[in-house]
Amino acid sequence: YNLIPNLTVRENIEVGAYLSDKPLDVNALLHTLGLYEHQRKLPNQLSGGQQQRTAIGRAIVKNPDILLCDEPTGALDYNTSKDILRLIETVNQKYGNTVVMVTHNDAIKDMADRVIKLRDGMIRKNYTNEQKIPAMELEW
């Protein structure tokens, strides 16, 4: 998750805030991420899902126009994966940024506005998803 091991959850997220001229409020974001109660913990004291949420928080706090998520559920169990997808969905709805998600999990496409499938570096499919499914309703 590329967290700085000797910094707390809050400090890891604040690193992102320092890199932005328009950062989000760290306290509000900690609440959105479900990490407010864990803000003083170090990364090695967190579960994999909490570490992933901290990494997402560090990216989101910069208030980017585009958020790139590369395999956001790759190393997580089913329930934690769904929690992370719900978090990404919530952040997208709350802050209005564009989310580009790269994944090998084909089921995740059902929550997207637009789907672009690649194979061997070539676009194989490119379509708008007419019937989006909320993250918590995805099954795989």
Describe each model-derived feature in a short phrase.
Residues 5-14:
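Short coil-to-helix segment of the ABC ATPase nucleotide-binding domain corresponding to the Q-loop/switch region
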Residues 14, 21-37:
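Conserved ABC ATPase "signature" region
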Residues 42-52:
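Conserved ABC ATPase signature
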Residues 56:
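Hydrophobic anchor residue at the start of the ABC signature
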Residues 63:
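Conserved catalytic motifs of ABC-family nucleotide-binding domains
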Residues 67-70:
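Catalytic Walker B motif of ABC-type/P-loop ATPase nucleotide-binding domains
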Residues 78-80:
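Helix N-cap at the start of a conserved alpha-helix in ABC-type nucleotide-binding domains
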